[in-house]
Amino acid sequence: MSRPNIVVVMADQLAPHFTGAYGHRTAKTPHMDALAARGMRFDAAYCNSPLCAPSRFAFMSGQLISRIAAYDNASEFKATVPTFAHYLKALGYRTCLSGKMHFVGPDQKHGFEDRVTTDIYPSDFAWTPDWEAPDERIDKWYHNMQTVKESGVAQATFQIDYDDEVGFAARRWLMNVARDKAQGNEAPFAMVASFIHPHDPYVARPKWWNLYSDDDIDMPAYVPDTHDPFSKRVLDGIEASYVALTEAEVRRARRAYLANVSYFDSKIGEMVKTLTEIGEIENTIIIVTADHGDMLGERDLWYKMNFFEHSARVPLIMAGPNIAQGVAPNACSLVDLLPTFIDIGGGSVDMVGEPIDGRSLLPLARGETDPVDEAIGEYCAEMTPYPVIMIRRGPLKYIHCDPDPPQLYDVVSDPLESNNLATDPDFAMQAASFASDVSARWDGEALRAQIIATQKSRRTLHAAMEAGAGEHWDYNPPSDASQQYVRNHMDWTVAANHYRYPPLNGENDET
């Protein structure tokens, strides 16, 4: 068998807790469930930063955000940082991105040979936070309670329009690969189809909304009596600390979220169907994941931007050739996917120049053991004036922010993280070990100074660009109408045969 193809189907803001594959009692995710049933489900997979752009840059690069200065949603993803798309292209793969990756900066491809849609979010420095004025909201930043209060049903939104385009463009690219293969191009392919749902706004099409009733929707399982200092800052930042929500509003937003999870799941089904139609399903490893989760009212919090389980954990499912059927309990994270993809593609770590922070998950995916049981997270964006560090090791998760008391949870026995063990005498040794690790790995003050410096630089650059000192970086997919479909310089029969798949091959195939 030839080297397997790789297809990543990526959601935005999808907490695994709200999927059938991970045990939600009413979530309707049949396509994700089917992949989990025949493949490997990773039960302790984390993002490396609970915010869209930095999480995706860690995913693409296999490096923690502090290593590549990818701190927030307006950090440049530098062209000098190798990505898994670069490595796979070097290994002979065709590479394609359809959908969102939130690239910031002039490089809008980062190793993808083809990019078949624009992004849904801006590619400039406008969303740069200011740690010297942490109480000020970013201009045009929409993460507040308005999106919860305005949740509900609509036939169309900018997100629905986008994801429908992403799905179509991804399937068309796969069909073009099949056409090329029929002409003799045997190169394996690697595609990322990256959708915006179920990211807020929590607005769903009637088709998906009607899959659920209000009785299907659980209210948040845990709201603490008092909030830790970091949570208080996030609550202030998203306006949840002073904008009251009714039970009906919370239930409606959670219902719309579940509806959009089902909508995303339908996109997984469409991708699987197309892979089947082009004869590649048996030689394709499909990976389902997300950039981060969504608190969805748990602990009074919404969206992401923290390291509690609903925000920091992500689904991670692999299915395909030589992937075992089962569940992997080891802690892992999105930085592990770059070495995993290199492993799948037949490469080795010898290809890697700058150090990476991940390890290949292929042994776990094959049902083998892995001595590593650790995931690392860093949050360096809005609603905090200092870096926030997370270490998940075994059943324990430690959260550190310089001005705040530490947090330590046993997320296996206490999945709601209701009991902070940081000052529990029975866990004094573990808490001290985690604190020592943080001190050894990170210089908080130096990292903070570096972050503030780049924030200042980016605000200056953005002001200059807004004044006309540069062109916008938003990606425009190339398109030449003179070469599409049938044109007068083409032989109609040749064009018709080019687009037909499977090709005629001299016979009229009715199957």
Q: Where are the language model's segments positioned?
A:
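Bilobed periplasmic-binding protein-like "clamshell/Venus-flytrap" ligand-binding domains
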Residues: 372, 431, 435-452
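Short, charged, surface-exposed hinge/linker loops at domain edges
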Residues: 447-467
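Residues forming the ATP-binding cleft of Hanks-type serine/threonine protein kinase domains
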Residues: 412
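Formylglycine-dependent sulfatase
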Residues: 1-401, 406, 415-436, 468-511
